Amino acid sequence: MQDQLQQFRTLVEQNLIDRSLVQKSFFFFEAGSNDIFNYFLPSNTPKPDPHAYVQAMLVEVETFVDQIYKFGARKIALFSLGPVGCVPARALLPGAPNNRCYGKMNVMVKEYNLGLESLVEHMHIKYPHAIGVYGAIYNIVQKFRANPTHYRKPLSFHIFYS
């Protein structure tokens, strides 16, 4: 994320992107799924407790918003994470259930999402003339998971090997 931000900063500072265009543009942000998933990977490095880890992630998001705001961004959408603890790869993690979602992981996701929502709610105070939008993805995904046939016929996949 920092590399992309640096590239964007360079374009703005070199006037390769007009600031008025930046002010009219929409900025969509969704990040954090891999961070939460990776928190549960085995490691010899000590980890902070889950709350501290999520708070550090939220500081990174706020830093990102600070920086794009300074470059002229005024329309910013932050999207929540979906239920990371329900991805099939979670079954590969030590101690994770393979027949249901990984609750500990989704607790972190929900805390992170609440922090994002709070950031958007207070955006107008910290960032004058900015418009913040929160995209609540988690609940939408959970509705699809709970009742998939309500939204669409189930898909069937055929895999062919050659």
Descriptions of predicted regions:
Residues 25-30, 38, 75-80, 133-136:
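Structural recognition of the beta-strand scaffold that forms the well-ordered cores
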Residues 7, 60-63, 67, 115, ...:
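Alpha-helical scaffold segments in carbohydrate-active enzymes
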Residues 49-56, 100-109:
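A short acidic, glycine-rich active-site loop
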Residues 32-36, 63-64, 71, 83-84, ...:
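Conserved beta-strand elements of beta-rich interaction domains across eukaryotes
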Residues 1-59, 63:
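Conserved SGNH/GDSL esterase-like catalytic core that processes O-acyl groups on lipids
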Residues 63-75, 112-132:
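A structural motif corresponding to the C-terminal end of an alpha-helix
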Residues 83-103, 118, 122-125, 129-162:
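Mobile gating loops/cap/lid regions near enzyme active sites that modulate substrate access
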